């Protein structure tokens, strides 16, 4: 291993530690409560569950126990029936649940790439030219998603 590679790895590890520390220090209760996007998402999740076509679950990465507790309490305050699966940072989501033929909606492209490689269907929340992209979970209500999925599976 070259000195340059060791220095690069050390820098990445320092950055990763700083990122994890950043996420550990966030006031998750306040952040989640103030997120209009998340609150709107749960309005759609309720409709998706009601229709019975999909069985949604919350699959979320966590960096600390405090974040996990805050996210769990938040989700439970919005919907007490949905499954919540917390994935420790550094572990791929497809290693925790079976991705095969399952749909993952995620804003992080790295998760989507791993999910696709594991046989799952990846949908970008936001925009990414490499994935079917959505900006609302409303696409999963009725037949909104079917056209986008047809395009993705061609």
Indicate residue ranges for each PLM-predicted region.
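Short, acidic loop-to-helix structural element flanking the phosphoryl-transfer center
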Residues: 24-58, 65-69
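N-terminal cationic-hydrophobic initiation segments that often serve targeting/anchoring roles
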Residues: 49-50, 76, 116
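Active-site neighborhood of HAD-like aspartate-dependent phosphohydrolases
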Residues: 1-29, 117-118
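Substrate-recognition "cap/lid" segment bordering the active-site pocket of phosphatases
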Residues: 59-102, 109-112
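A structural signal for well-ordered alpha-helical scaffolds and beta->alpha junctions
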Residues: 38-42, 68-72, 108, 142, ...
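Asp-based, Mg2+/Mn2+-dependent phosphohydrolase catalytic module
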Residues: 79, 95-98, 108-154
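A structural signal for short, well-ordered beta-strand segments and their strand-loop junctions
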Residues: 58, 104-105, 123-124
């Amino acid at each position: 291993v070259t000195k340059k590679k060791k220095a690069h790895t050390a820098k990445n590890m320092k950055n990763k530690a700083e990122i994890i520390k950043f996420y550990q220090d966030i006031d998750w209760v306040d952040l989640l409560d103030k997120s209009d996007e998340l609150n709107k998402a749960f309005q759609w999740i309720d409709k998706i569950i009601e229709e019975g076509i999909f069985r949604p679950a919350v699959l979320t990465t966590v960096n600390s126990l405090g974040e996990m507790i805050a996210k769990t309490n938040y989700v439970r305050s919005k919907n007490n029936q949905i499954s919540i699966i917390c994935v420790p940072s550094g572990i791929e989501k497809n290693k925790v649940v079976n991705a095969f033929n399952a749909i993952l909606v995620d804003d992080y492209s790295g998760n989507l790439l791993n999910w696709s490689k594991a046989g799952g269907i990846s949908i970008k929340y936001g925009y990414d030219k490499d994935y079917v992209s959505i900006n609302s979970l409303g696409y999963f209500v009725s037949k909104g998603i079917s056209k986008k999925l047809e395009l993705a599976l061609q």
